[in-house]
Amino acid sequence: MRHYEITLIVHPDQSAQVGTMMDKYKEIINADGGKIHKEEDWGRKHLAYPIKKIYKAHYLMMNIECDQEMLDKLNYNFRFNDAILRSLIISKNKAITTPSIMMVNKDKEKGKS
């Protein structure tokens, strides 16, 4: 099995359903023998450019280990989910379990308050 980093940009009107959406994808990954090494919710952020006249979106990131068949199944689900504006799947050499830069910056901002 290979390691992947998946980043999703979700429509801001669907932010309340992010939890159930992630549970659905976790079930797909775990049912087929995959593993989730890290899952992060980056929250709402400004987009660099508007997508479908939307200027803010909800960002999610997962590091998973799965086979190509499961990855194709996930990608199919991402494409036909209207709530997902964009998805990015990057192949990685190994599992990454450390917090991402986005989460480290978020924790620093909370510490300053």
From Swiss-Prot:
Transmembrane segments: none annotated. GO terms for cellular component: cytosolic small ribosomal subunit. PROSITE patterns: RIBOSOMAL_S6. It holds the Pfam family Ribosomal_S6. GO terms for biological process: translation. Keywords: Ribonucleoprotein, Ribosomal protein, RNA-binding, rRNA-binding. One of its GO terms (molecular function) is structural constituent of ribosome. Binds together with bS18 to 16S ribosomal RNA. Belongs to the bacterial ribosomal protein bS6 family. HAMAP family: Ribosomal_bS6. This is Small ribosomal subunit protein bS6. The gene is rpsF.
